Each structure stands twice: as structure tokens, then as C-alpha cells.
From Swiss-Prot:
It is found in: Cytoplasm, Nucleoid. Keywords: Cytoplasm, Nucleotide-binding. It comes from Streptomyces coelicolor (strain ATCC BAA-471 / A3(2) / M145). Belongs to the YajQ family. Nucleotide-binding protein. Signal peptide: none annotated. This is Nucleotide-binding protein SCO4614. Transmembrane segments: none annotated. GO terms for cellular component: cytosol; nucleoid.
């Protein structure tokens, strides 16, 4: 019987992030508590820019955006939001969407699979993803449930299960 395998990746669909951003912008423009405070959210190149005239309003904009991301099924671990910064008369928060698994994080996951996973399961780092293979599909299911039970500081998705 051939080896079964799956890939562990950390990817976010840009279209879903864009949809969440548009929904947040619409809610911000319509909510009464955001009237007259200059609150906005938009793309600024590859970063997301949130603006308002007070620190608590700009953090409220971030909360609205985070709630829209959750509703669209995007993990908040993929969102890297900075601290509110005063810029002129406005507060700004720059946020970015993190994609890919770094080498050190991939090594942590591979070590966890080797140490706590079933015997005969191999994990190989391939760029920004991790390939896990085994002769038994049951072992792969065990590895998936093991990883879902862990609390990593980055989002994980399991793809190409074969």
C-alpha cells in the first residue's frame, strides 16, 4: 500500500479578507457610535489601515474588523495588528495578514509530530509548508487531531489529504 500524506499550510484567502474588510467598512459607516469620529478602514498596499480620531474608537474599528474575519472563517492568528499610533489628529492601526509557516515554526511542528505523534509518521519541511506522510491514514488522522489540540501562535490548515 502506498504512503498517504497531507500538507500543513498557513494560508488565507485574500478575497475573504477583502469581503470582511468591506463588511467592516460598511458597518463603520452606518453605526451611530462611529458618526463624526472619522473612523475608516481600508487597504494601504499590502497592509490594512484603520483610522479614527480617538484611541478607543480605532480599537473599536479593529474589533469590528476582527468580528467580520471570524464570521468569514478566517483565524485571528493570521491577523498581525499593531498598536494604535497617534498621527496628527488621528489614531491609526496598521495590520497585516500573515501567511506561510516560518522555518522555526515548521521545525517546532515537525518536532511535535516526531515526539508525540504515532510511530512511522514522517514530517518534512517544504518551503513555507510541511508535508506529513505515513503508511496508515489513521496515523495521519491522529496527527491532525494532535495538531488541532495544540495552541500555536499561527493559523494551520490541512490540505492535499491523500
Amino acid at each position: 500500500m502506498a504512503d498517504s500524506s497531507f500538507d500543513i499550510v498557513s494560508k488565507v484567502e485574500r478575497q475573504e479578507v477583502d469581503n470582511a474588510l468591506n463588511q467592516a467598512a460598511k458597518e463603520i459607516s452606518q453605526r451611530y457610535d462611529f458618526k463624526g469620529v472619522g473612523a475608516s478602514i481600508s487597504w494601504s498596499g499590502e497592509k490594512i489601515l484603520m483610522e479614527a480620531n480617538s484611541e478607543d474608537r480605532v480599537t473599536a474599528v479593529l474589533d469590528v474588523f476582527q468580528s467580520k474575519l471570524i464570521k468569514r472563517g478566517i483565524s485571528l492568528k493570521a491577523l498581525d495588528a499593531g498598536e494604535p499610533q497617534l498621527s496628527g489628529k488621528e489614531y491609526k492601526i496598521f495590520a497585516s495578514i500573515e501567511e506561510g509557516i516560518s522555518q522555526e515554526n515548521a521545525k517546532k511542528v515537525a518536532k511535535l509530530i516526531r515526539d508525540e505523534g504515532p510511530k512511522g509518521v514522517k514530517a518534512q519541511v517544504q518551503g513555507e509548508e510541511l508535508r506529513v506522510s505515513s503508511k496508515s491514514r489513521d496515523d495521519l488522522q491522529t496527527v491532525i487531531s494532535l495538531l488541532k489540540g495544540q495552541d500555536f501562535d499561527f493559523a494551520l490548515q490541512f490540505v492535499n489529504y491523500r
